[in-house]
Amino acid sequence: MKKMAVQVTGLSFSYPDETKALGNISFSLEEGESLGIIGPNGAGKSTLLLHLNGVLKKDGGVRIFDEVIGKQNIKKIREKVGMVFQDPNDQLFMPTVFDDVAFGPLNLAMEKEKIKEKVTSTLAQLGLSGYEAKNPSHLSLGERKKVSLATVLVLEPQIIVLDEPTANLDPGSKKSFIRTLKKINKTKITASHDMDSIYDLCSKVILMNKGRIVARGSAENILRDKELLEANNLEVPSRLRS
């Protein structure tokens, strides 16, 4: 029997200026499943993602592998839930690719030889062998996104959370990154406006608008519903258009 990887129950959240970002969000995800979160700008997608590894905290609203996220276990939760942000510049700040990918393991006090081994194998997994000495700022956006992903995968999380993973990528880089993500055999949660990517990556979909879930179901059913998507400023994936 599969474990329940994520359980969100009645999650509501308002920012300090009283802007309501989430209203009574509930969903669950089994280990190994891939969930897409879609919706127009301002729907609350990114705010929801930030609750899944405790960047934003609301007591009792989120469980990761049946453990309630709280101040007492935030480090443990972040070891289980790896987050890849939309902009690689939010994750890459060291002078070399090796240093960026090694940063997390170094903070966990791993031995230097173990760190080198893990960084090398993670970069190889993503097709980045030989990139260790390169400066991330000199790489293409697609390459920087892969390095950002490597900084998460090197820590071996059980859940990968991705915020707009294909944003601003050219068609070739987008296809390459999607192929990379599909090979990662972990529980994945992806928020995106890119319906083609959601169709490629996700088996289940939640549609959000104005901080609430307005529809949920299989990716096949939700992403074929032209009327539903257009009502929420989204489009049917190109491969599903008649």
Region roles according to the model:
Residues 192-193:
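H-loop/switch region of ABC-family ATPase nucleotide-binding domains
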Residues 198-200:
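A short, surface-exposed alpha-helical micro-motif characterized by mixed small hydrophobic
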Residues 38-40:
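The feature captures the beta-strand-to-loop junction immediately N-terminal to the Walker
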Residues 53:
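Helix-to-loop junction immediately C-terminal to a conserved catalytic motif
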